[in-house]
Amino acid sequence: MENATIVERTLLTSDLMILKIKPDGGVPSFLSGQYIAIGMPGRAPRASHLPPEAEQPTDLDKIIKRAYSIGSSPEEKDALELYIAVVPTGSLTPRLLCAEVGQRLFAAPKIVGTFTLADVPGDKNLVLVSTGTGLAPFISMIRTASTWEHPGRRITILHGVRHKADLGYQEEIYRMIAAGAPLDYIPVVSREEPVADEFKKGYVQHFLHDGTVSLDPARDHVFMCGNPAMINEVESLLLDRNFTVHSKKQPGNLHVEKYW
């Protein structure tokens, strides 16, 4: 069942990491915004400093699986990059926290999901709203050349976290902006006070309510990934502003990743 290898592991904080994994058969084809299930057996060591897991595994050989959005571009064929927050009482992430480079693990053979840009017309701007590791699919999108192939398209990223140390990928986003990408970035921190203008204080939904980000259903497609409370509030706000939820049967301009 273990069919992939951890090839890189970066700990951003004590409970936030970037993991790169290489499936034995190579990186499968996928679209930015999709996710993959990975897992480790219950017998794998778990971080000892964390509280006991909420559900003890009864079969130590059974693979504990969870799904994670992919942060790497589909153009990257060496490995898949995952942005992972440790859940202290969880079953998988405390085991991933113990894993070292070279560790074997399970990776689903297929990458799936409908939270992609496939149905977005090229003349539409993108507003990408996330909290925590919900940023991952948007990093994949902005790393992918085809996202930028549409003249006049502008992309806005709002990323909400508790502490500024949790603003993963901030430096990469700023480098893209400095290089001339038509990209706006609004980092939002809820539990620290900003120094100068390094971030905004509060919650991402506040900066959609107050007009910091101008939204027009005729011009913009909004994508949301992260905390369900944020998603519900933003969805309600945008439905009142004549946005419509996208589905396979009914195309719209409001795209929601329900997994959390």
Task: Identify the residue ranges that each predicted region occupies.
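Ferredoxin-reductase
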Residues: 1-100
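Generic structural signal for buried aliphatic residues
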Residues: 36, 105-108
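Short, surface-exposed secondary-structure boundary micro-motifs
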Residues: 41, 110-111
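A short, basic/flexible loop-to-alpha-helix module at the beginning of a structural domain
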Residues: 111-121
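Conserved beta-strand elements of the Class I
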Residues: 126-129, 223
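Ser/Thr-glycine-rich phosphate-binding loops at phosphate-binding pockets of nucleotides
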Residues: 131-137
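Histidine-anchored nucleotide/phosphate-binding helix
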Residues: 137-148
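Reductase modules of NAD(P)H-dependent flavoproteins
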Residues: 156-260
